[in-house]
Amino acid sequence: MGRESRHYRKRSASRGRSGSRSRSRSPSDKRSKRGDDRRSRSRDRDRRRERSRSRDKRRSRSRDRKRLRRSRSRERDRSRERRRSRSRDRRRSRSRSRGRRSRSSSPGNKSKKTENRSRSKEKTDGGESSKEKKKDKDDKEDEKEKDAGNFDQNKLEEEMRKRKERVEKWREEQRKKAMENIGELKKEIEEMKQGKKWSLEDDDDDEDDPAEAEKEGNEMEGEELDPLDAYMEEVKEEVKKFNMRSVKGGGGNEKKSGPTVTKVVTVVTTKKAVVDSDKKKGELMENDQDAMEYSSEEEEVDLQTALTGYQTKQRKLLEPVDHGKIEYEPFRKNFYVEVPELAKMSQEEVNVFRLEMEGITVKGKGCPKPIKSWVQCGISMKILNSLKKHGYEKPTPIQTQAIPAIMSGRDLIGIAKTGSGKTIAFLLPMFRHIMDQRSLEEGEGPIAVIMTPTRELALQITKECKKFSKTLGLRVVCVYGGTGISEQIAELKRGAEIIVCTPGRMIDMLAANSGRVTNLRRVTYVVLDEADRMFDMGFEPQVMRIVDNVRPDRQTVMFSATFPRAMEALVRRILSKPIEVQVGGRSVVCSDVEQQVIVIEEEKKFLKLLELLGHYQESGSVIIFVDKQEHADGLLKDLMRASYPCMSLHGGIDQYDRDSIINDFKNGTCKLLVATSVAARGLDVKHLILVVNYSCPNHYEDYVHRAGRTGRAGNKGYAYTFITEDQARYAGDIIKALELSGTAVPPDLEKLWSDFKDQQKAEGKIIKKSSGFSGKGFKFDETEQALANERKKLQKAALGLQDSDDEDAAVDIDEQIESMFNSKKRVKDMAAPGTSSAPAPTAGNAEKLEIAKRLALRINAQKNLGIESQVDVMQQATNAILRGGTILAPTVSAKTIAEQLAEKINAKLNYVPLEKQEEERQDGGQNESFKRYEEELEINDFPQTARWKVTSKEALQRISEYSEAAITIRGTYFPPGKEPKEGERKIYLAIESANELAVQKAKAEITRLIKEELIRLQNSYQPTNKGRYKVL
């Protein structure tokens, strides 16, 4: 016991030293156990309270941390520091209390229960302490991160503030420096002006720089200077000064040249010191070199000048040239020397020879005798070798007579069937004509011009011409539309003795570059190939302008397969005493062509075509002719579906595609071609065995040219023509062609033609055979120009492309529609329904009214006046007829006639007399009435599709529903140029409504529909008299 007491004494002493309350044990075990239980329960309660308080504090700390993360203010940082210090104090106090509890644990004589409780307490205290340590570590790490973040933020703000201060300081220094430099520069300039002046021996352009610098300095001094501008000015001035000094310093060294490079200015090279003073001075160029070389204002001026020059040149071309003021150099036309063999021939022998050569007929005096071989026409050995090389063995009938006539210098009209060699007939004399003249000099135009109606024919003639021109050293240029003009201009500028052209593009070439591309001053030989077709297609004005610009003593030659009499009078205007040579009659199909005409229904045409293709296509190439571009494309698709590879050729195809198609067809790459009449002229294809007129030709000459594509150069050919009963009017021309060519006419074709003649006679119509040559070209007069301008203005206004700077403002399309409407407006006062326009008469009034009527009838019967008189006259006529007497002409007073005429005039002028208006107002004032608004819009003169757009049932119903106005169609349609008779009116729309706004809405909707249709028609405008050929 002594030891135990001593032991407890020591613990109590230690407790006393630590400042805690001392405990003493009682000698009784029972009392000690109760005390221990009470103490353990109190400790448990304390621990639970501590844990709950610690949990609350942790949660509050976590919330505080989240709030502190979002906040960056220093006040909250200080409060956080205070909270952290308090938490540290609490943790220290908790650690001291735990140390006291651990030292006050019970000895080994305690009960198991107490020991277990103490052990559980120690374990829980150990777990709590470890958790607290982890939390403390996390809090310390977070605090360090926060402190580091705050330090970085503060450091960044401090750096930014210092940076701003340095920038402001640098700007202030630069501003001061710039002002000082400007002052120094001014002083230097003044010193340079007062002292000796530097000079460049080779460059005088910089002498004005000091004055300019002084001026700039004064201007900048007068106004507030921007520091950056001042700095840049300073740099420029220093660079100039540096360049001046370097150039001045290098002036003493002879032959010193080297580039002076700076950061701002481009390379400046000094010249040799010793230079002739008469040479051109150099130029010091700054950075803005592009501005010196290019200016949009200068470009506009150039464009305007070029346009004015082009229009002026074109106007000059359209005007005839005064050849009396131009001195042309003489030239020789007559090269023909008749050989003795031909000179010995008598006139009878000549006539017999001409008859043997397919019946050559000659008109005109002084025509030479026909030749029999190439040698007799007087051509050079080079041409003779070329003829032999290309297989021309002997002259054809047209060549035997045409070549000596042209060689004699005479103008010629050559008429021969297709494939007879007309091209060689005018080419060989042309070569002889050109070789006799001097060679071309720079800037001179051609000597010979060949004009054709189509591009394909121009290319074919060019190809034929080049066979001979290469050996002769002559240059040939083909000028036609549809391709780039720049290449053709380049070829013409290089010079060419021969030009093969289409008329439209030739005029463009003559007008290009103010006439510097080419000219007609040296032209002495003019050829018009297919002349009739050229005039028929509307090229007469262009051809005449070109021909009128050529010297009057030229030699002009015309060739064609057909030459209607109507064209001959026109052609003789440009020929001088021509000789007409005709071979084989006028417009005859070659005898080598077997012609077949089939009367067939439209639906069976394609099957018959497939039958012909199956029979003939293996033997050679085939051309199928149609009348329209749309039909050509449609037939192409049908043939492709039937597994027949083919191509189409018409005026709507691009020129490059047309050239490639013709080349492929000539080479045999493609053996089937669907074409319009664009391929009917001058197209020479070898091995062409069949021509099918899928669409019947509409005139005789067209048939001859189509059939003439086959059976050329002595080969056998076949021509089939499909004709339907609806095309009976064309049967006469086909019968004529068959008869003239000696082919039997099919019976069904004769029957079709006779039925058509009988039908026309029964209807009282005269049958007219059309030659087809009724085309009309441009007149180039004021009327056409005005129409073209109106069309352009209408299109610009519709699309909103009108330029405000145009002198002639575009006519508003709405104003045009309004003027064409010829609108008539009326407002009528109508009586309200259910009301009477007159008061109900009483008995006394009825008697008086009856007496007044009888008196009025008697007066009218005596005087025959007014409307009642007309009724009385009609009654008298009726009574006279019933009694069987004669009817006398009623007498009508002048007043009645005048009133009727006045009413007609008022109706036309839409005029209501004042008397009627006052009567209507009085009637309206006496009775309840309403106004009815009426407006009439005349639509007779609008295009047909525009009329359909607003007169269809759906359109009228839609407009009525939209505007709540009644719309009716009245009047009769009258074609342009025909005026309505008395009592009739042109077709118009009558709009009626009790609301004026409804009438206006209906009119606006009708105007909108017509305007849309007019714009659509304008955008898809196609000329009605469009030719088959497209030549630009």
Swiss-Prot record:
Compositionally biased region (Basic and acidic residues): 26-49, 112-200
Source taxon at top rank: Eukaryota
In-chain residues carrying the UniProt-annotated modification Phosphotyrosine: Y294
Domain Helicase ATP-binding: 403-581
Cell location: Nucleus speckle; Nucleus, Cajal body
Cross-link (Glycyl lysine isopeptide (Lys-Gly) (interchain with G-Cter in SUMO2)): K186, K325, K779, K908, K916
Gene Ontology CC: one annotated term: nuclear speck
Protein known as: Probable ATP-dependent RNA helicase DDX46
Originating gene: DDX46
